Amino acid sequence: MSDKDRITQLLRELEEAKAREAQERCEKERLQLEHRKTTFLEYLRNCHRHLYNALRLTDTSRSSTGYTKVVGKYYPKRLRPWTNFTNVLHPHYFNLVQQICGQRQLFESASTTKNLGTIISDHLAGNEKAIDRFEVDAVERPVQGILKVLATHEEAGKASICPEFRFSANLRELTQKDDGSSGADDNTSDRSLERRQQAGPNKRPTSKSKYICSNRQPDGVGIRMQPDGGQTQAFIYDYKAAHKVAIEHVRSATAKEHLFHEVVARINDDKLSRDEEVQHREQAEAFIAMALTQVFDYMITYGVSYGYVAAGRCLLLLYVDRDDWQTLYCHPCLPADDVGEPTNDWTDRLSHTAVAQLVSFCLSSFQSEALEGQSLETALSVAKATLKTWSESYADVAYLGLEPAELSSAPSSQNTDISEYTSKAKPTGRKVTLRSCKPAAVLPQGNEHDEHDEEDHSEPGASRLAKRERGPSSGGKDDGRSMVDPQPTRQYCTQACLLGLKRGKDLDENCPNVSLHRFDGSSRHPVNAHSFTDMVEQQLLLSPYKGCRMVDFWGKRGAMGWLFKLELLPYGYTFVGKGTVEDRLNRLEHEGRVYARLDHLQGDVVPVHLGLVRLDRGYILPGLEFAVYMMLMSWAGQTPSANMDDAETLKSESLTAIWSEGVDHGDNNRANYLWNAERCRIMIIDFDRAHLFPPLKARAVSRLSKPKRKRETLNSYLTEITGREARHVFKQMDRSPMATPSHGG
């Protein structure tokens, strides 16, 4: 090889080495870029490209079929574009989040998002359950991650735009069948509803039975944390199979102001076009109208102004103004159309991604307070007088589709009898405007609405609501909604106070309300346990909201009920009630029997049990449920702090105490073990799943030859307790005088 050839070869090798080095450097940078955290805009791009676009739909012939059951549910009179979200709210919040996040790398890496997208693409989505999984992974999880960053950011915190937040899909717990014998406690309203809606003695279903709704349980709810630690609903959402909200018809359907009237009329008349293309469009419109109706009904009955339908390829973001119940505002979110194909620079289109729009939707909803208790009942009374339920028709739109000749021949009674469709509420009640759902003052909500009742017995809740309208008003005769029942605001009475009331002993001077309990300078309680329960029941019979409020619907609910704070107004006794629905009375009665077994442990190991009362009208709950029974108790305390070192030891001591009385708690949920500062110990609550057995009396235990046999007796119980707890129970048992063999024969 000549020198010239040698030089040429060396130069070529040098160039190749440089190229390899450059390639390795690029690959290293690419990997670093893939694995580093991302900025806000990068994260939106990755979520759309790798998650949203990963959705694969099954063939429609293999998809789930059937209509959404909406008969008996409220539906709006008008459907209008939510232009205030499109033009004001979304641009404002998108720019605000972009400003707060800036170029900081706060979100998960591109490689993590890609890996999740691969998992999503491995599964075909053909039903609501599959869409549920997709929405959680591709939309809800990223949205919650972005909101979490905002909640911890100082600027956002000062503006109070973003509290702690979570998506929750655990709404069906109270209607699901319990294990074992408690299965008899199932809510029977669905079965009775079906029976009421069957036609004739032969029990044949009506022609509309496929549309009949059986419950008001949405797929999910957006939960926000309150400053006091409570949790309230911000919005409601529901999943729909992608083929039930056909994206090719979404824009045209949601642009129809009288979509609901058209669909209801077609279904009532049982008429479909013979043209196959028109028939397909009409069926798509029916699916969309029913999906919107379902969420609209949830929004009304759960007391929120915001909701959305998630159907994989699209989101339908919804809003209702409490000053205009008959109008539903809708913003269709179609990312595939609005974002389009990926390009080098998506910046101007990233605001149209599903994640970006749902973030703005959530932030908008946080500026509105959910209605509850008395305000929810008032709102539902207005809704019942204003709205129609599927498949009733609104009077003034019933003939929109008729020709003049047909209109003149229509029954005159339907044109002139306006009273049937106007509010039956007292005129004075209209003077009070319900709480506005407008965002902060700096964000004008705009004028979304124009200037421009038959009782439904298909739902148990609706029937009870009608009863409330006929019953006495909690606010007086002249201004039914202008007066609000007094709410309990005092500190809880002490265990010693309420135990003294129950036992007929002296007042507890350490009770924060003792001055209200004392009459004529006496040291004794002014009432006994029996009269106390009677007076509480009479107070709640006058109004379920008088001296009573729900503590925390989402955070303080158990397997069968909710927690209420109550005050017996003349005497200042302040305590709690465990409220439940009609069909769970036997569970409360069973719990009362458990408290009776634990009588001498009340006020120390378990709360003081003060009896059971019935609320004739019921305390309204989100979703048109009613708490009609309450078990009255002393306030047990708070969840032990995470840094309480001896919490498990104290818990085991309390478990040992109730076991010795013949009670197996049966529910090891940590929420059932509360720290009581007054007694300096863990108190146990919620005995609806407890089992009773003969108590371990000292004489019976003395016949055991050795403590080991008692350990065997406890074995089944201790299998549900951690090893450390079990060892402590044994240690306590060995130290107990009951465990010492008797030498007296």
From Swiss-Prot:
Subcellular location as annotated: Cytoplasm; Nucleus
Chain positions covered by the region annotation Required for antidote activity: 214-325
Any one GO biological process: meiotic drive
Bias (Basic and acidic residues) ranges: 188-197, 466-482
Region (Disordered): 173-222, 407-487
GO molecular function annotation: DNA nuclease activity; kinase activity; toxin activity
Stretches the record annotates as Required for poison activity: 491-745
Keywords per UniProt: Coiled coil, Cytoplasm, Nucleus, Toxin
Chief location of this protein within or outside the cell: cytoplasm
InterPro entries, A to Z: Kinase-like_dom_sf
Cross-referenced SUPFAM superfamilies: Protein kinase-like (PK-like) (SSF56112)
Residue stretches in coiled coil: 4-34
Compositionally biased residues, Polar residues: 208-217, 409-422
Lineage top rank: taxon: Eukaryota
Entry's Gene Ontology cellular component terms: cytoplasm; nucleus
Physiological role: Promotes unequal transmission of alleles from the parental zygote to progeny spores by acting as poison/antidote system, leading to poisoning of progeny that do not inherit the allele. May possess DNA nuclease activity that leads to spore killing, and a kinase activity that confers resistance to the nuclease activity.
Protein name: Meiotic driver SPOK3
Organism for this UniProt entry: Podospora anserina
